[in-house]
Regions:
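Mobile genetic element proteins and their domesticated derivatives, centered on retroelements
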Residues: 2, 18, 34, 38, ...
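An active-site-proximal beta-strand-loop segment
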Residues: 69, 73-108, 114-116
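Short small-residue beta-strand/loop micro-motif enriched in glycine and branched aliphatics
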Residues: 104-110, 164-167, 191-192
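Basic, flexible linker segments flanking DNA-binding modules
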Residues: 1-75, 171, 225-234
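Residue-level detection of the helix-turn-helix DNA-binding "recognition helix"
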Residues: 23, 39, 43, 155, ...
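C-terminal domain-tail junction helix/linker
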Residues: 158-162, 184-238
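Active-site beta-loop-alpha junctions of metal-dependent nucleic acid enzymes
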Residues: 111-134
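RNase H-like two-metal-ion nuclease catalytic core shared by retroviral integrases
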Residues: 56-58, 142-144, 150-151, 157, ...
Length: 238
C-alpha cells in the first residue's frame, strides 16, 4: 500500500504525506513505522534549486512590507503572494508567474510565457481578481522585481482594491512561502522529467498545478488538498 501511494504520486510524497494518505484510507501507522518501511522499500522522495532574480534596482515606487512575514491568513483571499520563476526547456526560457493564497496555499491564478514581461503579470492579477467577492480586498505581496515597481502594475492593483506589499531589498525570507512553492514545483515536476518540447512542458505544468491544488494533501491543511480545505472551510458555520 505504501509503495502504491508513493508511485501513484510519482515519488512526490515523503513519509509524512504517506502517513496522512494512509489515514484517509483507514490505515493508521505512525511516522516511525512508515519511515522505516519506506527505507526498506528504497522509496525516497526527491530535493532544492536556484531562483530567478527579477530585481534591477529601484526603477519605480517601492511599496511598504505590509505582510511582514505574517504568512497565515484567517480566510480565503485575505493575503496573496507572487513572484516569477524561470525554466530552461529545450534551450528556451519559460517564465511562470503565479499568485498563491496564504490561507490554503492554493495557486489562484498564473501565467506562463516565453518572456518575463509586464503583460503576463497584469493578466495574472486580473485572473485572480475575477475570483473576488465585492467586499474582498486582499493584500498582494511580492519582492522588489521590476514588474512590481511599474506604475501600470500598481494602478491595476488599485483598480481592483488590492493592497500592494513588497519584501525588503534582497531578503528572500520575506516571501518564503512563494519560494517554497517554486522549490516544490521544480523538485516534484520539472527535475523529474525530460521534456521533448515546450508544448509538452506547458501541458505538464498545467497538469501539475491542477494536481497541486486539487489532489496534493498537506499536513498543515489537516491532511487535505488546498481546494478541499477551502471548500470545507466555506461549509463550516460562521
Amino acid at each position: 500500500m505504501i509503495s502504491q501511494l508513493f508511485h501513484k504520486h510519482q515519488g512526490r510524497y515523503g513519509y509524512r504525506r504517506i502517513v496522512l494518505a494512509l489515514k484517509h484510507m483507514g490505515c493508521h501507522l505512525n511516522h516511525k513505522t512508515v519511515c522505516k518501511l519506506m527505507r526498506q522499500l528504497h522509496l525516497k522522495s526527491t530535493l532544492r534549486p536556484r531562483r530567478y532574480k527579477s530585481y534591477r534596482g529601484e526603477i519605480g515606487r517601492i511599496a511598504p512590507n505590509h505582510l511582514s512575514r505574517s504568512f497565515d491568513a484567517s480566510r480565503p483571499n485575505e493575503k496573496w503572494v507572487t513572484d516569477v520563476t524561470e525554466f530552461n526547456v529545450c534551450g528556451q526560457k519559460m517564465f511562470l508567474s503565479p499568485i498563491l493564497d496564504l490561507y490554503n496555499r492554493e495557486i489562484v491564478s498564473y501565467e506562463l510565457h516565453e518572456r518575463a514581461h509586464l503583460g503576463e503579470v497584469l493578466r495574472m492579477v486580473k485572473g485572480a481578481a475575477q475570483r473576488l467577492e465585492a467586499h474582498e480586498r486582499p493584500l498582494l505581496h511580492s519582492d522588489q522585481g521590476w514588474q512590481y515597481q511599474m506604475g501600470q502594475y500598481q494602478q491595476t492593483l488599485k483598480d481592483y482594491g488590492i493592497t500592494q506589499s513588497m519584501s525588503r531589498k534582497g531578503n528572500c525570507l520575506d516571501n518564503a512561502v512563494m519560494e517554497n512553492f517554486f522549490g516544490l514545483l521544480k523538485i516534484e515536476f520539472f527535475y523529474r522529467k525530460k521534456f521533448e518540447s515546450v508544448d509538452a512542458f506547458s501541458q505538464g505544468l498545467h497538469g501539475y498545478i491542477h494536481y497541486y491544488n486539487h489532489d496534493r494533501i498537506k499536513e498543515k491543511l489537516k491532511g487535505l488538498s488546498p481546494v478541499m480545505y477551502r471548500t470545507q472551510s466555506l461549509l463550516e458555520p460562521t
